[in-house]
Amino acid sequence: MNLNDFDFLLPDKLIADRPVSPRSSSKLLVSKKLEQFMDEKFYNLPKLLSSNDLLIFNDTKVIPTRLKGKRIRGNSSSLINATLISYDKDDCWLTLIKPLRKINIGECLNFNDGVKAELIDKSEGFGVLKFNIKKNNFSAFLSRQGFMPLPPYIEKRRASDSRDIKDYQSIFAKYDGAVAAPTASLHFDHEVLKDLEHLGVKSSFVTLHVGAGTFLPVKEINIKNHKMHTEWGCVDQSTVDKIIEAKSRGGRVIPVGTTACLLYTSDAADEGLGVDLGGRRI
């Protein structure tokens, strides 16, 4: 497939930079048959499901890993944004830095709370920062100074702020590890979950920590040549049992969003259901 086949016009006025409130008041496009579409509200989702169905959610939790810092050179300084992707070793973190191109290896970047980091390597759009703070102290530092990483199309319109801590986290997020939220999950609120439970719709969870690739553009004209970054995922035995049970009673297994779908299908295709997939390209 050619990358240009996916180009289309989307007017700026149709792009929201904040989610609707309440969450479940968002729009829902329903396709019952090929080329037959209906506009709905998300809070009506329970009416489209049956008691035999099983929803699979991704319970990953987004870490506020976006840091705002300064690059100081002589008497001048410039602002930089650094999004921590993963811990390497020896207080080093793989980081998405903007603007990385202008920063030289060996330069020191300054963050709040007296935290500093040296750029010790950079390649393929990422930098490796060595911090003057230990890994076991990083969670407390991020809770004070970290912001939620936002999609690039929103970043162009506004800066990340404290509201995003809640807005870009699903209500059932449990396990720390993602740099971005599994977006489909953000539409669910407690009322919708209660309605689903009342109707007898079952649910279960998988964990896929959304990785750095979600923020990187596809540059290959032939998208088959695009290299995906690794992501960690797990489908536990409890979820496997619920999937088998749902299929045995004639129900549908419905992954919520692409992250849950990719993990579910990758697990089944490669290993058979029920494994810790670890870090892999899925």
Regions found by a protein language model. Give the residues of each.
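Surface-exposed, charge/polar-rich loops and edge strands
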Residues: M1-S266
